[in-house]
Each structure stands twice: as structure tokens, then as C-alpha cells.
Amino acid sequence: MDGIKYAVFTEKSLRLLGKNQYTFNVESGFTKTEIKHWVELFFGVKVVAVNSHRLPGKGRRMGPILGHTMHYRRMIITLQPGYSIPLLDRETN
């Protein structure tokens, strides 16, 4: 699971959980096929679709030196109905 950094919990990603879609930030060098294979292998689920977009890095300043953080990719993974990732499911009471 070297390619997947962490799960994302924003307003949009929490809304997508209801549609059985999970959001992850991943290393920018990996393909959709590799991420799909890793998610299916690690979580034991069936992936239907993988959508991605690249987010830009942010500018950083340390005194007079300008720099920036690295860009990364965000993957939205749609699972087949009946499957879920239990660690990321939100409890609804």
C-alpha cells in the first residue's frame, strides 16, 4: 500500500460515502489500474470505477526563500453494491 497516502474526509467525500464511493490521496506517479488493484487486494472489495484528479502543490515561504509542496492525486473509488470498507464507514444513528 505504498501508493495510497491516506483517506480524505471533506464535505464532498463524506457525501460520496452514501453513494459507496471512497476518497483517497495517492502518490502522483501511480496509475488508476495500480490503485484499483491495491484497494481490491488490501480491503477485499470489488472496485467498479476509479476517478482521479491532480491537486496542485501549495506555496511555502521560509524567510526569503520561496518553495512549494509537491502536488498529489486524489482518487475517488466506486465500489460494487454490497461491498464497503468498514474502517471508513461513517456511523449513522
Curated annotation (Swiss-Prot):
Q: Which GO terms describe its molecular function?
A: rRNA binding; structural constituent of ribosome
Provide the leader sequence positions. none
GO CC annotations, alphabetized: chloroplast; ribonucleoprotein complex; ribosome
Keywords on record: Chloroplast, Plastid, Ribonucleoprotein, Ribosomal protein, RNA-binding, rRNA-binding
Please give the PROSITE patterns that the UniProt record associates with this protein. RIBOSOMAL_L23 (PS00050)
Q: Which domain of life is it from?
A: Eukaryota
**Where in the cell?**
Plastid, Chloroplast
- Could you tell me which SUPFAM superfamilies the record lists for this protein? Ribosomal proteins S24e, L23 and L15e (SSF54189)
What biological-process terms (Gene Ontology) are attached? translation
> What family is this?
Belongs to the universal ribosomal protein uL23 family.
The subunit field of the Swiss-Prot or TrEMBL record says:
Part of the 50S ribosomal subunit.
Its annotated function is as follows: Binds to 23S rRNA.
How is this protein named in the record?
Large ribosomal subunit protein uL23cz/uL23cy
Give the species: Saccharum officinarum (Sugarcane)
